[in-house]
Amino acid sequence: MLSSAHVVPTSVRRAPSWICSSSRSFMDLKALLSSLNDFASLSFAESWDNVGLLVEPSPPHTVNTLFLTNDLTEEVMEEALQKKADLILSYHPPIFRPMKHITWKTWKERLVIRALENRVAIYSPHTAYDAAPQGVNSWLAKGLGTCTTRPIHPSKAPNYPTEGTHRLEFSANHSQDLDKVMSAVKGVGGVSVTSFPARCDGEEQTRVSLNCTQKALMQVLAFLSQDRQLYQKTEILSLEKPLLLHTGMGRLCTLDESVSLATMIERIKRHLKLPHLRLALGVGRTLESPVKVVALCAGSGGSVLQGVEADLYLTGEMSHHDVLDAASKGINVILCEHSNTERGFLSDLQEMLGVHLENKINIILSETDRDPLRVV
């Protein structure tokens, strides 16, 4: 069972959006990227995502000003250049699909051109920050009230706990040429071997356990298959990377005390600083219906929230049919528009990175970045 994190709403001291101090020093880009990865590992990102350093000026490149934005539009790029940014941290990756050419034809190509011409690097964390324990989804959960949270889809550790991806085990009695077997498997690269005495069917035997890579597994099996009796006793286990506590996509939040849906709506509006949001009432639900469990996912949460049992789904956007499906099950759905469930995190990020980077560089927030959709 996964451990849970207890979320208590807190007031965070806000730094001005444009901090500029001549006492700040520079950081080498590579050193800064290493620190950013220490803050939230890019290994947390989804496999389909495009994260990390997307645009790099010719080295050496030093950073005095880090510019934070949710979306890097041409308007935001102009602001970043005016404020002398050396590195733009854009939550959403401005380069996602492969580019076949870099011309002045499209706005995303123009972003790359302007960045390189002005020696500005571009970095995107995206789903790595969604999954991180101190990331976007945890920030979104702060607006619900005091609650216990856990990831809906926990992340896996980047590495296996032991060498190899598979474990192969077999038992051999002393009448078999065990020394020959052990010598052969130890000679295969990518294999670690342990052995210990074991009693099987009333007979003293030796239990052999091998951790192997996929490639080594096939080599070991090819050797063991030469001994029919030994091969038939061989067990193969596929190893899994361990789950990471408090890290993963979405959050399932259990409130310490139930509140009405109407109260929850006001809390979310206040947290996201929104005058309006979109609501789909679950079948049989009203604004006075109690809310105890909230499943949330910043951005587009349809796939993450699908099938999760909760009183309320909170996300930026979902497809029409996903909303209908949730409502039919009595689940209320609140949609706030995609980036409105993400952008507010940047203020917390500004302060957290300031501490993490020991205030070595200027960290400023975009003032022109905004959700493209408006209620009219």
From Swiss-Prot:
Residues bearing the modification Phosphoserine: S258
MF terms (GO), sorted A to Z: identical protein binding; RNA polymerase II-specific DNA-binding transcription factor binding
Encoding gene, per UniProt annotation: Nif3l1
Any Gene Ontology CC annotation: mitochondrion
Record note on quaternary structure: Homodimer. Interacts with COPS2. Interacts with THOC7.
In-chain residues carrying the UniProt-annotated modification N6-acetyllysine: K108
Gene3D superfamilies: NIF3 (NGG1p interacting factor 3)-like (3.40.1390.30)
Listed name of the protein: NIF3-like protein 1
Main location: cytoplasm
Region of interest called Mediates interaction with COPS2, as start-end residue ranges on this chain: 243-376
Species the sequence originates in: Rattus norvegicus
Similarity field: Belongs to the GTP cyclohydrolase I type 2/NIF3 family.
InterPro entries cross-referenced by the UniProt entry: DUF34/NIF3, DUF34/NIF3_animal, DUF34/NIF3_sf
GO biological process: one example: negative regulation of transcription by RNA polymerase II
